């Protein structure tokens, strides 16, 4: 006889709620001051010109302008004035 019950469904079905991380605006889009550009854990994307970094590594715009991404050894996000 089996020493485990063959019930599956009632004991499964747990998962954590998604955290909605990632880019919130794409390159070339217009943003206003304080707009969230990226939600992330750690620094997958790094702040560059006119971009601030919050305590939870969220990147946000410091000025009104256009979002620009640049990839070297790291991916940088900046906001250029219009």
Swiss-Prot record:
Annotated family: Belongs to the bacterial ribosomal protein bL27 family.
GO cellular component terms attached to this protein's record: cytosolic large ribosomal subunit
Keywords: Ribonucleoprotein, Ribosomal protein
Chain residue ranges for the region called Disordered: 1-51
GO molecular function, one term: structural constituent of ribosome
Domain of life: Bacteria
One BP term from GO: translation
The UniProt record lists the keyword Chaperone: no
Protein name: Large ribosomal subunit protein bL27
Disulfide bonds: none
A matching Pfam family: Ribosomal_L27
């Amino acid at each position: 006889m089996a020493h485990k019950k063959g019930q599956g469904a009632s004991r499964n079905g747990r998962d954590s709620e998604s955290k909605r991380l990632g880019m919130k605006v794409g390159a070339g889009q217009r943003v206003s001051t304080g707009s969230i550009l990226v939600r992330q854990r750690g620094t997958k994307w790094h702040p560059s010109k006119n971009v601030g970094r919050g305590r939870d590594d969220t990147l946000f715009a410091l000025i009104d302008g256009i979002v620009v991404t640049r990839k070297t050894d790291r991916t940088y996000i900046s906001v250029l004035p219009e």
